[in-house]
Amino acid sequence: HPNLPKYLKKFVIMGGGTFGNVTKSGETAEFNIWIDPTAAKQVFEKLEVWMVGLNSTHSAALSREDFNDMIKLCGDGEKAYLVRELSKYSQVNSFDKGQDNNVIHDALAVASVINPDVLRFEKHYVYVEDGDVINNGQTVIDLEDKSGKEPNCYVGMEADKELFAKIIKEMCAYYGSLK
């Protein structure tokens, strides 16, 4: 909708990044952009985007201890169901494979809206590749501002992992306190 930008205070996405997770030829595209790169390209061209990409979400990976703390803070029963399931997923997806942490990608995007200090952003020009066979869906970030194009995106660079864990645990404690 052409009037949408004037109604938005801030447009934050979990997608893109300085590396990807889907293409076989070097993992240049991130799934949320790759699934519809033409639409993503329009978004980046029409809106000022705050991009929480894979590079930033991976910098906020949580440990097994963090997940155990989250379960304890949520309490028993249905309140802890989602956290327990997320912990099971982390066990299979990461911990059983020898990794010592796991990422809750979308939660970092939400946390960056709640508390902007959780993520360091830099403003750069970002182009979405939507025609290249090999790099289709890649977010090309002009980190050195060589293109001469006006920066159109706040790119999440690195998370404050401790602050992110604190925000997540505070949320779990809140839900754990509900009757």
Describe the role of every protein-language-model region.
Residues 34, 52-179:
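Conformational coupling and interaction surfaces
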Residues 1-59, 64:
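Active-site histidine-anchored catalytic micro-motif
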